[in-house]
From Swiss-Prot:
Its cofactor is Zn(2+). The keyword Metal-binding applies. It is found in: Cytoplasm. Keywords: Aminoacyl-tRNA synthetase, ATP-binding, Cytoplasm, Ligase, Metal-binding, Nucleotide-binding, Protein biosynthesis, Zinc. InterPro entries: aa-tRNA-synth_I_CS (IPR001412), aa-tRNA-synth_Ia (IPR002300), Anticodon_Ile_ABEc (IPR033709), Ile-tRNA-ligase (IPR002301), Ile-tRNA-ligase_type2 (IPR023586), M/V/L/I-tRNA-synth_anticd-bd (IPR013155), Rossmann-like_a/b/a_fold (IPR014729), tRNAsynth_Ia_anticodon-bd (IPR009080). This is Isoleucine--tRNA ligase. The lineage of its organism: Bacteria, Bacillati, Actinomycetota, Actinomycetes, Mycobacteriales. It is an enzyme of class 6 (ligase). The keyword Nucleotide-binding applies. A motif ('KMSKS' region) lies at residues 627-631. Coiled coil: none annotated. It catalyses: tRNA(Ile) + L-isoleucine + ATP = L-isoleucyl-tRNA(Ile) + AMP + diphosphate. ATP binds at residue 630.
């Protein structure tokens, strides 16, 4: 063994003298800051091809959370990797500033309860406060992003409230308007009464928008009074009651019609004596298919009088349920509407056109004008005086009571259903007819679907599934908000309808041209103050005034690719070469949010996708499997994790999980610590091992002839190729899997099996040191994007150079590939692992030698060259190889009927029968039974062994090991000696000796063990570097070695 070891590494010490990862990370972060390493990574590549990454802007009026942490790690890994592959990757950070989130937070801080208080405060004061509060937590965000080792450019970032950004948004609106893709319409929209603004359909599909809610449902009567003059309806139905069902009783005061499906059969039923009081003995009309659903209300003795299609009910008139709009033109008749179904209710649908899109469209066909007795606060107006001033949901109780008193209620129930709520305030929405501005998405919908085919999605099923289906059903996008803090809708209209005119502006220059002043702010109220005489008014009395709405903040975030660079007013060439982006990432809910608005605007403005590749990850959940909640404290504090385990551990935990393939992830402290065990510790331990035994700097070499060196270098070839391929395809979880597997081979096999060569030293075995150095130097370049800080510490410690993040990602062809060796050695590892599992099951310690292990697998001869390794690793005297697997056991196939049944249906029983009779064969990863293919998961394999207690399967191959566990006195003595060696090594360590120190040993043993000690003196002394070794009996010595054995150890 070499006398001089250690002291060569680290070439540069970034550990700060500690092996605590969070402490190392702080050293690395400080170094990067002082060295300006991120800036150098950009400067080094500035002449290279660019990899374009768009960073979705967060709001800075709240603190970041695990969702931001997860997305941020991906946003760091991909650019780091692409940089190491030779690309220039700019990472500009932006801030989302406008919209409801900002206003609501400002209202909360100011104690404002409604819009009236904002207007009393003054728009300028309110918006100034919003501008300040929206950036309240920017420093916390910067600290957080920096601590997670994410490299971003804060200095050249953008804010959506900047004048340049807002001007680009104006340009986008004007361009869409000129293309005929923007219009003002009056439509039923999801409306937030709490925030006084309509929302877009996609906003009602965002996370947390739908919540479970209990609401009353009513079935009420509408007495038939006559027949319209132009109708063929049967007058004999006059006096019958049409039954209609609703889940929104508050809309009944606005009822103007009923609707039936002309293709559905309806019945006239005579209600029995046991029927509901409101209809007892009366004739009622409802869908034939729903009679059973109303059996109780109709009474057991009810009688079906007539059956007729819905088309023969159209044109019947009825008595209004309330008299508020009794004289409304064309109202209170039964209409035809094919959307009416018999899935629930009565098959007759009450129509309140102000509060239902289908209702509005149907009533419009019949010339029924909309009436809206609800104000912007969601409260009834003077049009319905009995309920005036009541919030519509609160009015349900009074309305139901009044209808019951009038004898109009047939059934009153309560249902719990999923109902849309405001994604920001959390209050339930209502659907109400409102004037709004729309992007006519339906005009470009087909093109959006086509362009989506060009996008590479991770997970792939989202393209044609969640996102593709949404695109296929995309509706016109409501982009106006009746709010204050946002980009203005750049439309000016005449204030005199006798002289109509509409002007739309797309630049500051256009505004200056018409208004004679260049705006210093595009925010309200300044932009509202721009007025001018109407050029189309010869009287000169009318004025052009801006419409009061502001833009949906999602329009701004969708404009980010071009607005961040003030396109098209500046950087036109830049944008033309930076769109579409090579890569974006957010959570999967953004298929209704940012991904969608990016796609809409890119299609409408540029006729191309906004991005080429996108990762849509799943949701981070608390440790109880539910949404993270501060009140429930169901997740570990992020800063505590950073301080205890480190950011690299958190990064590994999140990035190696199924969440990046669209699944959800439960965050637990144990899971985070597992990241340390799986990747950080194996790398660090291998590096520490090299540090410990190196007496001189190692060289980068791939030329060793030693079989273990050849194996680990071939594995290195494979992991470089596999991780590169995974990261090329943004499959970060697979990259982590590959690294984890390699680290296991490196530390639990290569280093451990090579210990004797390292103990002998780098003069006697330089190839071992060269190989481990080469592996670690390469591995840290592979892991640099995945584990940026520990990789930096190890790589700089090995090389002394500036930063691993300024190095190139390795090329697989730099290393010798050897598929046959890797396959064979991996099988050897499998054999050893299987053998150890049998030992463990029988509680036979590894230091106890056993007589024999039989390895049975096809083509077993290929392991003959490795028999000595197996023998030494599993501590047996003999290794027997056989290809006759059937002589020691077999594998029976068992069909998993629960899994296979849904796909195979009746054929599953045929497959089960065939497998039981042996009529099947293995074909790769499948089983074919009587011609029926069973895929992975639809079957399992069960080992049937000749000697079950001593036999187990070799993982990953169709092979078995059989361990002979017969013990002899000789084997037990040798095992005891090995235990003594371990105990003496522990005594050396406890005494503070260096690994190369020679020692003197006096071993005190029981009389019955003295002969065993003397028999194995040479072996024990050699292993513990004892120049003097004495075996005695008598009084116990200083160090406990094994049961009944003590020792004195002294340094020579």
């Amino acid at each position: 063994m070499s006398d001089a070891v250690g002291g060569v590494y680290p070439r540069v010490d970034m550990s700060g003298g500690t092996n605590v990862f969070p402490d190392m990370e702080r050293q690395v972060l400080e170094y990067w800051k002082d060295d300006e390493t991120f800036k150098a990574s950009l400067t080094n590549r500035e002449e290279n091809p660019e990899y374009v990454f768009y960073d979705g802007p967060p709001f800075a009026n709240g603190l970041p959370h695990y969702g931001h942490l997860l997305t941020g790690y991906v946003k760091d890994i991909v650019p780091r990797y692409q940089t190491m592959k030779g690309k220039l990757v700019n990472r500009v950070f932006g801030w989302d500033c406008h919209g409801l989130p900002a206003e609501l937070e400002a209202e909360k801080q100011l104690g404002i309860k409604d819009k009236g208080e904002i207007e009393a405060m003054g728009l300028e004061s309110f918006n100034n406060y919003c501008a300040k509060s929206v950036l309240e937590y920017t420093q916390e965000w910067k600290d957080y992003v920096t601590r997670q080792a994410r490299w971003v450019d804060f200095d050249n970032g953008y804010k959506t409230m900047d004048m340049d950004f807002m001007e680009s948004v104006m340009w986008a609106f004007k361009t869409l308007y000129d293309k005929g893709l923007i219009y003002q319409g009056f439509r039923v929209l999801p409306y937030s009464w709490a925030e006084h603004t309509p929302l877009s359909n996609q906003e009602t599909r965002l996370d947390d928008s739908y919540k479970m809610r209990q609401d009353p449902t009513l079935t009420v009567t509408f007495p038939i009074t006559g027949v319209k003059d132009d109708s063929a309806a049967d007058a004999s139905l006059v006096g019958a009651y049409a039954l209609a069902w609703t889940t929104t009783p508050w809309t009944l005061p606005s009822n103007l019609a009923l609707a039936v499906n002309p293709q559905v059969n309806y019945v006239e039923v005579k209600v029995g004596d046991q029927g509901a009081e409101a209809i007892r003995g009366q004739r009622v009309l409802l869908a034939e298919a729903l009679v059973g659903a109303y059996a109780k209300e109709l009474g057991e003795d009810h009688e079906v009088l007539t059956v007729r299609p819905g088309s023969e009910l159209v044109g019947l008139t009825y008595q209004p349920i309330f008299s508020y709009f009794a004289d409304h033109e064309n109202a209170f008749q039964i209409l035809a509407a094919e959307y009416v179904t018999t899935e629930d209710g009565t098959g007759i649908v009450h129509q309140a056109p102000a509060f239902g899109e289908d209702d509005m469209n149907t009533c419009k066909e019949y010339g029924i004008e909309v009436v809206i007795p609800v104000d912007m606060d969601g409260k009834f107006t003077s049009l319905v005086p009995e309920y005036q001033g009541q919030l519509v949901f609160d009015a349900n109780k009074s309305i139901i009571a009044d209808l019951k008193a009038a004898g109009r209620v047939v059934r009153h129930q309560t249902i719990e259903h999923s109902y849309p709520h405001s994604w920001r305030s959390g209050e339930p929405l209502i659907y109400m007819a409102l004037p709004s501005w729309f992007v006519e998405v339906t005009k470009i919908r087909d093109r959006m679907v086509e362009l989506n085919k060009e996008i590479d999605w991770m997970p792939s099923h989202i393209r044609d599934g969640q996102f593709g289906k949404w695109l296929e059903g995309a509706r016109d996008w409501n982009i106006s908000r009746n709010r204050y803090w946002g980009s203005p809708i750049p439309v000016w209209v005449s204030d005199d309808e006798n002289y109509p005119r509409v002007d739309v502006y797309g630049s500051l220059e256009e505004l200056e041209r018409d208004f004679g002043v260049r705006p210093e702010s595009l925010h309200r109220p300044h932009i509202d103050e721009l007025t001018r005489p109407n050029p189309d008014d010869p009287t000169g009395k009318s004025t052009m005034r801006r419409v009061p709405e502001v833009l949906d903040c999602w329009f701004e975030s969708g404009s980010m690719p071009f607005a961040q660079k003030h396109y098209p007013f500046e950087n036109k060439d830049w944008f033309d070469t930076h769109s579409p982006a090579d890569f974006i990432v957010e959570y999967s809910g953004q298929t209704r949010g940012w991904f969608y608005t990016l796609h809409v605007l890119a299609t409408a403005l540029f006729d191309r996708p906004a991005f080429k590749k996108v990762v849509a990850h799943g949701i981070v959940l608390g440790d109880d499997g539910t949404k993270m909640s501060k009140s429930r404290r169901n997740y570990p504090d992020v800063n505590e994790v950073f301080n205890r385990d480190g950011s690299d551990a958190m990064r590994w935990f999140l990035m190696s999980s199924p969440i990046l393939r669209g699944g959800n992830l439960i965050v637990t402290e144990q899971g985070i610590r597992e990241g340390v065990r799986q990747a950080l510790l194996p790398m660090w331990n291998a590096y520490s091992f090299l540090q410990l035994y190196s007496s001189k700097p190692a060289q980068w070499s791939v030329d060793s002839s030693d079989v273990l060196d050849r194996y680990i270098l071939a594995k290195l070839h494979d992991v470089v190729a596999a991780v590169g391929d995974a990261l090329d395809n943004t499959d970060i979880a697979r990259a982590c899997d590959e690294v984890r597997t390699f680290c296991d081979a490196l530390t639990n096999w290569y280093v451990r099996r090579s210990r004797d060569r390292f103990w002998a030293g780098d003069t006697e075995h330089p190839e071992a040191f060269y190989t481990l150095y080469t592996v670690l130097e390469t591995l840290t370049r592979v892991t640099a994007p995945l584990l940026p800080m520990v990789s930096e510490v190890i790589w700089r410690g090995l090389t002394g150079e500036r930063s691993v993040h300024l190095a190139d990602f390795p090329q697989a062809d730099q290393f010798p590939a050897d598929d046959d060796l890797v396959r064979a050695m991996d099988e050897v590892r499998g054999v050893c692992s299987a053998t150890s599992s049998v030992r463990k099951a029988h509680k036979l310690r590894n230091r106890l030698p056993l007589p024999k292990v039989t390895v049975a697998l096809p083509e077993s001869a290929r392991l003959a060259d490795f028999a000595d390794i197996i023998r030494d690793e599993v501590n047996v005297k003999e290794v027997a190889l056989t290809s006759d697997v059937d002589s020691v056991g077999r594998f029976d196939v068992v069909v998993n009927a629960k899994v296979a049944g849904p796909r195979l249906c009746k054929d599953v029983q045929r497959a089960i029968k065939a497998v039981k009779s042996g009529n099947y064969e293995r074909r790769g990863d499948t089983v074919v039974a009587d011609g029926i293919e069973l895929v992975a998961g639809e079957f399992t394999e069960r080992l049937v062994a000749a000697d079950p207690d001593s036999t187990t399967q070799i993982d990953g191959v169709d092979g078995l090991v059989v361990l002979d566990m017969t013990l002899t006195e000789e084997l037990e003595a040798e095992g005891w000696a090995a235990d003594v060696i371990r105990g003496l090594q522990d005594a050396r360590k406890a005494s503070g000796f260096e690994v190369s120190d020679r020692i003197e040993v006096k071993l005190v043993v029981p009389e019955e063990k003295k002969e065993w000690a003397l028999r194995h003196t040479d072996m024990i002394a050699g292993e513990v570097l004892a120049t003097s070794f004495e075996v005695v009996t008598g009084e116990p010595a200083e160090h406990d070695i094994v049961a009944g054995v003590t020792a004195t150890v002294q340094k020579v």
